[in-house]
Amino acid sequence: HDGDDTLHSIPYQPSIFGFFYNKTLFAKAGIESTPTTWAELDAACAKLKDAGITPITADDAYLTSFIGYHLARYIGQDGVKALVTGEEYNGESVTWDDEKVKAAAESFADFAKKGYFSKNIATNKYPAGQNQEFAPGNAAIVICGSWLPNEAKDSVADDLEWGYFNY
């Protein structure tokens, strides 16, 4: 605060959130580029599964972030906020019965039916997914933030080559 009612700030802890992946496991499954769309993520997960590799894991603390992130691809970030708060978005209410909301949910159900999620994803308590599945190379993708490398450093396989993507 500089005395003229102007508040100044310095970014303290910038971070990103998305998909960390194991480059070695992607190469083993024949994936040559990182996914940039849901369809490409679907195709990559199919290749991983076919290669006997668990495609995706997460922890309880971050799984809902993945859902919100994906839902925003259908209704926008402001639409997700409106859905959660009950506010209007673009002059209309957004409900759980909205066709786009249903489509996002169905795409998650499709991934589950295809076996793309770790069998432990629903019960992983932070930091199990990142430290017991992703870091040692037992799952190819983990949904997490930029704090992951530091948090998982004691569990990381010696040959882990990190990568990061969003779609």
Language-model segment annotations:
Residues 144-149, 167:
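Beta->alpha turn/N-cap motifs
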Residues 45, 87-121:
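Glycine-centered hinge/linker elements that transmit conformational signals in sensory
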Residues 29, 114, 154-167:
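Extracytoplasmic/periplasmic substrate-recognition and gating elements
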Residues 1, 76-103, 154-157:
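Short, solvent-exposed loop/beta-turn-alpha elements that line the ligand-binding surface or hinge
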Residues 51-55, 135-144, 160:
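Alpha-to-beta junction loops
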Residues 1-17, 42, 100:
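Hinge/lid segment of periplasmic solute-binding proteins
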Residues 36-42, 120-135:
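Short helix-initiation/N-cap motifs at beta->coil->alpha
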Residues 8-9, 50-60:
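Bilobed periplasmic-binding protein-like "clamshell/Venus-flytrap" ligand-binding domains
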